[in-house]
């Protein structure tokens, strides 16, 4: 039932909306995270260690995923909810 809904036109709009939310969340979180580290600790990107890149990248991914999951609920209701009568 879920796969059938996702393959419909509304399902494709829902998936596109999720992709848009993830991209927006990732760009905002990236800007805040990377900019915060550079401002707070005065460490330019050229001086970052590999572990700093890994930690910051995983933090960006996790936060973006959380925001996407949270916004998937209203998007799912809007796009995949039942038909109003």
Curated annotation (Swiss-Prot):
One annotated Gene Ontology cellular component of this protein: plasma membrane
The keyword Transmembrane belongs to this UniProt entry's keyword annotation: yes
Keywords, alphabetical: Cell membrane, Membrane, Transmembrane, Transmembrane helix
Localization: Cell membrane
Superkingdom of the source species: Bacteria
Annotated TM spans: 14-34, 60-80
Entry membrane topology: Multi-pass membrane protein
Protein name in UniProt: Uncharacterized protein YnaJ
Naturally occurring in which organism (per UniProt): Escherichia coli (strain K12)
């Amino acid at each position: 039932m879920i796969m059938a809904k996702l393959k419909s036109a509304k399902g494709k709009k829902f998936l596109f909306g999720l992709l848009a939310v993830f991209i927006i969340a990732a760009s905002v979180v990236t800007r805040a995270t990377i900019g915060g580290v550079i401002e707070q600790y005065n460490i330019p990107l050229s001086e970052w260690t590999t572990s700093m890149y890994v930690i910051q990248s995983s933090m960006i991914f996790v936060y973006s995923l959380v925001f996407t999951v949270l916004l998937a609920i209203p998007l799912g209701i809007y796009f995949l909810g039942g038909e109003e009568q």
